Amino acid sequence: MINTIKQDAKNRMEKTLSVYLSDVDGIRTGRARASVLDGIVVETYGGRVKLNTISSISVSDNKTLLVKVWEINNVGAIKTAIINSNLGFGFSCEGAVIRLTVPDMTQDMRKNLVKLLGKISEDCRISIRNIRRDIMDKLKIMQDNKDISEDDLRIAGVEIQKITDEIIKKINDTFLAKEKELLHV
């Protein structure tokens, strides 16, 4: 029973970490990365589809992304979606290929992105600690109901804290690496 609760805690924390990592990966750093376009949704085929489902996205060089559109009649809709995304990319079209140029980032932009990164990181840490608190509350209720002993509660608490510390270390390491990438000119 305790192992199930510990596994639940680990799963919930890892899902939170996964969402955090995808959020951090979406932050622009001044270098061309295909993942920056992951959130772009295109109005086509009478609905909304993700850009990467109707085209292939690749990195040409440090400042250029290539979007190879699979059906040329989608080029206009993709251009509109990129413009509406407010990513600030310059672009040119050559048939079914859209070339996106990543603009240089100003120091102010970099500082604002570091602040955003810090906020996202802190929100994730808070979520992880809330998961730990919820799990510990469940364990305390179990101990109050005499389902587990006080020793079991203490041992489980230490193990839950160990899992929490590992996840928060990953968050901190990711934050520091991304901060270094953002501030590197």
Swiss-Prot record:
Belongs to the RRF family. Keywords: Cytoplasm, Protein biosynthesis. PANTHER family: MITOCHONDRIAL RIBOSOME RECYCLING FACTOR PSEUDO 1 (PTHR20982:SF3), RIBOSOME RECYCLING FACTOR (PTHR20982). It comes from the Bacteria. Responsible for the release of ribosomes from messenger RNA at the termination of protein biosynthesis. May increase the efficiency of translation by recycling ribosomes from one round of translation to another. It comes from Ehrlichia ruminantium (strain Welgevonden). This is Ribosome-recycling factor. It is found in: Cytoplasm. GO terms for cellular component: cytoplasm. Its main location: cytoplasm. GO terms for molecular function: ribosomal large subunit binding. InterPro entries: Ribosome_recyc_fac, Ribosome_recyc_fac_dom, RRF_sf. One of its GO terms (biological process) is translational termination.
